[in-house]
Design a protein with these regions (language model features):
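Alpha-helical protein-protein interaction modules
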Residues: 1-105
Length: 105
């Protein structure tokens, strides 16, 4: 069965939208689907990590952060702040808080 090469990107963006909407479980589901479609899609790893942190699931958050670090070596809060600008400051603060809760420094 042919695959849509953009499905992973769609799911990753949908996961990010769910995160912004405070729907962290849905964000995790969409990020996982994105990663199932394309395991190297770093954006999905980031959404999964931040959403897991906000859910307060230490096992999932630790595993997600480990996967993110494999997919994007050297990723840090400073990199995310610098490279992923967000329109609304409250969204940026919550996104960064998710990474902090997942164990990122």
């Amino acid at each position: 069965m042919p695959r849509d090469p953009l499905a992973a990107i769609y799911c990753g963006v949908a996961g990010y939208a769910q995160f912004i909407g405070h729907n962290y479980e849905e964000a995790v589901q969409m990020a996982r689907e994105s990663m199932r479609q394309r395991g190297d899609f770093v954006g999905a790893h980031r959404v999964l990590t931040a959403a897991a942190g906000m859910l307060g699931d230490p096992i999932l958050a630790s595993s997600a952060l480990e996967g993110l670090r494999r997919a994007q070596p050297g990723v840090s809060l400073a990199w995310i702040t610098r490279e992923l600008p967000m329109l609304r400051e409250e969204d940026r603060a919550r996104y960064l808080e998710g990474f902090r809760r997942a164990g990122m420094e």
